[in-house]
A protein has these predicted regions:
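Single conserved hydrophobic/aromatic residue that forms the stacking wall/gate
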Residues: 190-200
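Glycine-rich adenosine-cofactor-binding loop
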Residues: 168-172
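Surface cap/lid and interfacial helix-loop subdomains adjacent to catalytic sites
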Residues: 157, 184, 198-200
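Active-site-proximal beta-strands of protease catalytic cores
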Residues: 133, 185-189
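Active-site entrance/lid segments in N-terminal catalytic domains of soluble metabolic enzymes
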Residues: 1-161, 165
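A generic structured-segment signal
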Residues: 163-167, 177, 193
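Catalytic cores of alpha/beta
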Residues: 120-128, 173-185
Length: 200
């Protein structure tokens, strides 16, 4: 167990990326049941569907899971309250200022990690009181810094400034990438791989 798995409760230090329209209950529960940490997306903006997917998780797994809240694209703020009311224990925020909902989430006992593409963003997130960081290098999907800093360089730069647990996001696809991420200070790894039932 490391600092991030202590927060997620997952067996393995692997977290499934919250890909829009893809990271729904089928994928997230499969990851959870395999020992990783599944995350439900809300970036699609399909609020009712995403809420239904969160509710389905209790039927598909008895393992902990998370929800991603992309702040710039959160079309319905009721999603935040829904997470609180439905016992979600881990939230990743991204694409915006985490201070907007940090007090509500933390008051409810929810662990909050914020996705950052830069050292400056990491410092701001830490100052807001997040519990950890999703450090996203230029190799990853989603929103990245125009400075295009590689993941391993970015993790090391942030680690020198901030002592928060780090999830590494971007371009990690095999054991060598995992080992490298752990070596530079990551505690958990984002992966975006998806498989159908025949090869899950």
């Amino acid at each position: 167990m490391n600092r991030v798995t202590a927060h997620t409760g997952s067996k393995y230090p692997i977290i499934q990326a919250p890909m829009g329209w893809i990271a729904r209950s089928q994928l997230a529960s499969a990851v959870c049941n395999a020992g990783g940490f599944g995350v439900i997306e809300t970036s699609s903006g399909e609020v009712d569907n995403c809420k239904a997917e969160i509710e389905k998780m209790s039927e598909l797994t008895d393992q902990p899971f998370g929800v991603n809240l992309p702040l710039l694209f959160l079309r319905d703020e009721s999603m935040v309250e829904f997470c609180v009311q439905h016992g979600v224990k881990f939230v990743t925020t991204s694409a915006g200022d985490p201070s907007k909902y940090i007090d509500i989430l933390k008051y409810a006992g929810i662990t909050v990690y914020h996705a950052v593409p830069s050292v400056e963003g990491a410092i701001k997130a830490a100052d807001c009181g997040v519990d950890g960081l999703v450090v996203e290098g230029t190799e990853g999907g989603g929103f990245k810094s125009p400075e295009e800093v590689g993941l391993f360089v970015l993790i090391q730069a942030i680690r020198k400034q901030i002592d928060l647990p780090i999830i590494a996001a971007g371009g990690i696809a095999d054991g060598a990438g995992m080992a490298a991420a752990f070596a530079v200070g990551a505690c958990l790894l984002y992966t975006s791989d998806a498989a159908d039932d025949s090869i899950r």
